Amino acid sequence: MASWYDALPALVAELAVRWGLGVGEAGGGGTSRVYRCLRDGETVWLKLTPDPVIATDEAEALRAWADTRSVVGLLDQDLRVGALLLAGVEPGTRLMESGWQLAHVARLLVELRSVTYDRSPQLAPLADRITFLYDLADRRGTADPDLLSRGRAAALEMARTGPADGLVHGDLHPENVLIGAGGRLVAIDPRPALGDPDFDAVDWVIEGVEDEEQLNRRIADLAALVPGMSAARVRGWCRATAPLIGGAPAFLAPWPPHTLPPHGQAAR
């Protein structure tokens, strides 16, 4: 990573010339670096990652969602160097800073689920994303190993028994949603996979709940607004991924995999 950061100034300068960018302040961290830029008087974002696979997968998903207004637009790319040029979103306030209503999130989820993904090369299955997340949690060592083991088994069973071909954002939470023109919600920073799109509902139904009754009400309310969403599957994903979510309520400890709701089970 140190060598990648050392090479960034030259790479940014090269891309700025190629794409006609006036480069402004930088931000981001973890797996990417993001630069606010101007092109032809409009704000655009230059996103760089040291892992070309991450950039390739993100670009693939953004192209698939290109006809929706609820996902940031992809303007250009150089996947060889892990570079994406993304459209600006104005005002661009992160949803976590402004608060949100379930009905608005439901409209975002409906848009994300409206795309039929039949492109090649194929994105990785959701089970791979789950394995990555639990491997990361294991390495960090901040959660109970038995809880992580049960959560991993439950999540992989959820992936195995659910839809295999839905386009999943994979990292959809209020930090990765911006407010666009007219209050429209715009998703950014996908870590996409193919599988059960109900996976993307978890953060929206867990946040702030204090007991299982409140969780079930919120899940039922969201499922009523999103065609094709299974309340039972969303509950299953909440339990299966709870060990990965900081501050998840204790009542969401993963249940044994054999008790998970089957794909398509009706809400109760």
Question: What is each PLM-predicted segment?
Answer:
Residues 39-42, 79-81, 181-183, 239:
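Short strand-connecting beta-turns/loops that link adjacent beta-strands
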Residues 220-225, 233, 243-268:
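Helical subdomain adjoining the active site within ATP-dependent kinase catalytic cores
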Residues 4-39:
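ATP-binding glycine-rich phosphate-binding loop
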